[in-house]
Amino acid sequence: MNAPLAGIWPWLPLLLTWLAPEVSSSWWYMRATGGSSRVMCDNVPGLVSRQRQLCHRHPDVMRAIGLGVAEWTAECQHQFRQHRWNCNTLDRDHSLFGRVLLRSSRESAFVYAISSAGVVFAITRACSQGELKSCSCDPKKKGTAKDSKGTFDWGGCSDNIDYGIRFARAFVDAKERKGKDARALMNLHNNRAGRKAVKRFLKQECKCHGVSGSCTLRTCWLAMADFRKTGDYLWRKYNGAIQVVMNQDGTGFTVANKRFKKPTKNDLVYFENSPDYCIRDRDAGSPGTAGRVCNLTSRGMDSCEVMCCGRGYDTSRITRMTKCECKFHWCCAVRCQDCLEALDVHTCKAPKSADWAAPT
């Protein structure tokens, strides 16, 4: 081995770590980190000092955030279930999604927004359930108020979403605020859009009091909607995401195509076009669609033509147990038999290239 290279060789893994592009939100890996709060705070790679401080100071909040990761990743996978990129996660990768989010694409915009929303949702819910020392129900919702139906009393436990938003902003945005590059600004914008999305679906719920439920007196509280509403809303924002470029002074965005409107704080923004995700690509972090189940009768993104990228599909027949011949019995039960059902399953063919199965 060449002498100068021999001196560098022991340091090569560290040098590669420094030079490799990085996905900012390493806190996503908190889902996979068990043990005490100290173990979690010290072993999640990539946290900046502010995030570690908050982690050590608020271990109960970190547990809520860690549990919330599973919820928002499941929501991401639900929204992308019929698409070539299906929000698949990598258990052994501290970025959770691998290299696919290194590209400043619409998919990256959605993941940053849904993850930020997930933190708000998880913290706010934990507050209302009395699981956090630093917060409880919304202290501002007290006394009497009015709405279109008349006067009511604040009661019950209103979700303290403002606390959830403040903590999420401090923790999630900490790493991006240390950077001044375009990607950091993109992430901050989409993080904020995600937080705002949760608050958008805060709803007033009421209980009537009076003779025979006459509603002479109402007690009301504010509650977050099911997280699916936030996911559906951000999915619509993903489909309408706006491609942007940095402005000349590097402090904000301008639309890449002048025919499109300027993005609002609720919109998702991105810089780069997405890959087609058709084949496994180590550099792009794309797992490809070989082996994915497709829908032969669909004309949408889950159709065999679109999902398989024109490569064709294989068909296999499987059997599964289903309920059949169900009958209503008085009173009051439905009884069914177990039947075997045969059905065809269509899966995308692999590319003809010999290296398609190379691990990412």
From Swiss-Prot:
Glycans are attached at residue 295. Gene3D superfamilies: 3.30.2460.20. It comes from the Eukaryota. A lipid is attached at residue 212 (O-palmitoleoyl serine). Pfam families: wnt. Belongs to the Wnt family. Ligand for members of the frizzled family of seven transmembrane receptors. Functions in the canonical Wnt signaling pathway that results in activation of transcription factors of the TCF/LEF family. Functions as a upstream regulator of FGF10 expression. Plays an important role in embryonic lung development. May contribute to embryonic brain development by regulating the proliferation of dopaminergic precursors and neurons. This is Protein Wnt-2. It comes from Loxodonta africana (African elephant). The gene is WNT2.
